[in-house]
């Protein structure tokens, strides 16, 4: 996170450690859960030779929405990627990403016998937390217990892969279809725990090539497109309130329908206190 405080276990409940030799060939993968991280009991189980150089990559929060591809065949970290497993299956929609983090370190094992080597891998966010809320549309049919959400949200041209260098792969983009829930207390549809890969370039600046996302909302029953908006333009308009280049960046979006008019705007809670009502 921004700052010097050690907050590893607050943001990550699982870390996978990929160990490579100095040429970039994979030697093994170790996984460590939140309990091990919290109590500092994670003990790597790799047999490393004294005097040799190694590279490690730490991946945080790789759960159901994360797979690592090419690590067994590629030696260039720029060609090893995190992605949602469904990206490789055209019949399965991608609905989310995990709250991933990435970090890497290169080190040389000491030659001295019986010497313990200790080092630190700093992890950086690979994701942006996204909150989308939709106001002014009819609620689901309350008379039916099995009533489905009648609207489909999507982000076209979404970044599909992030490399072990923690850089977005600009040549791989696709459409993500986040699940919507209906919030009866706040009378709106909204996303829940949605994450997208980052939208800033290698210098940490918002870049149109990294943010080609198009937000689309459709009526599932009729196929009618209700609204379409360019995410990059939205971020430029609201640069004083939203900064997606930060660590732990958040992207709040409100879609508001008023009669025949629809608008993509900042949620009211961003202006008031910066926290959504459901958090």
What name fits each language-model region?
Residues 1-10, 134-142:
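Short amphipathic, basic-aromatic surface patches that mediate peripheral association
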Residues 2, 22, 51-53, 61-63, ...:
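Generic structural motif
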Residues 5, 16, 25-126:
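Short, low-hydrophobicity acidic/polar segments
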Residues 11-71, 142-240, 278-279:
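Tryptophan-paired
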Residues 56-62, 128-146, 243-255:
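Repeat-unit-sized solenoid/scaffold elements
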Residues 80-125, 135, 229-279:
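Extracellular beta-sheet/turn segments enriched in Thr/Pro/Gly and aliphatic residues
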Residues 87-188:
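A sequence/structural signal for flexible, mid-protein segments enriched
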């Amino acid at each position: 996170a921004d700052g010097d405080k050690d907050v590893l276990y607050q943001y990550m409940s699982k870390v996978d450690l990929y160990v490579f030799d100095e040429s970039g060939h994979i030697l093994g993968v170790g996984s460590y859960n939140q309990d091990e991280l919290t109590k500092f009991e994670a003990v790597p189980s790799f047999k490393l030779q004294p005097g040799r150089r190694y590279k490690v990559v730490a991946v945080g929060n790789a759960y159901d929405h994360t797979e690592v591809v090419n690590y067994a065949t590629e030696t260039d970290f720029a060609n090893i990627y995190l992605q949602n497993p469904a990206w490789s299956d055209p019949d399965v929609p991608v609905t989310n990403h995990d709250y991933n983090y990435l970090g890497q370190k290169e080190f040389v094992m000491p030659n001295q016998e019986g010497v313990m080597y200790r080092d630190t891998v700093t992890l950086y966010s690979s994701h942006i937390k996204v909150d989308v809320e939709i106001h002014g549309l009819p609620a689901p049919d309350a008379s039916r217990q099995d009533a489905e959400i009648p609207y489909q949200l999507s982000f076209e041209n979404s970044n599909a892969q992030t490399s072990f260098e923690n850089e977005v792969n600009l040549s791989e983009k696709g459409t993500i279809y986040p699940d919507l829930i209906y919030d009866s207390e706040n009378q709106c549809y909204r996303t829940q725990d949605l994450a997208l890969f980052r939208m800033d370039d290698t210098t940490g600046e918002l870049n149109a090539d990294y943010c080609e996302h198009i937000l689309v909302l459709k009526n599932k029953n009729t196929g009618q497109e209700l609204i379409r908006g360019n995410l990059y333009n939205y971020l430029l308009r609201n640069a004083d309130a939203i900064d997606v280049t930060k660590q732990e960046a958040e992207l709040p979006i409100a879609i508001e329908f008023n009669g025949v008019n629809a608008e993509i705007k900042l949620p009211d809670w961003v202006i008031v206190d910066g926290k959504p009502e459901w958090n």
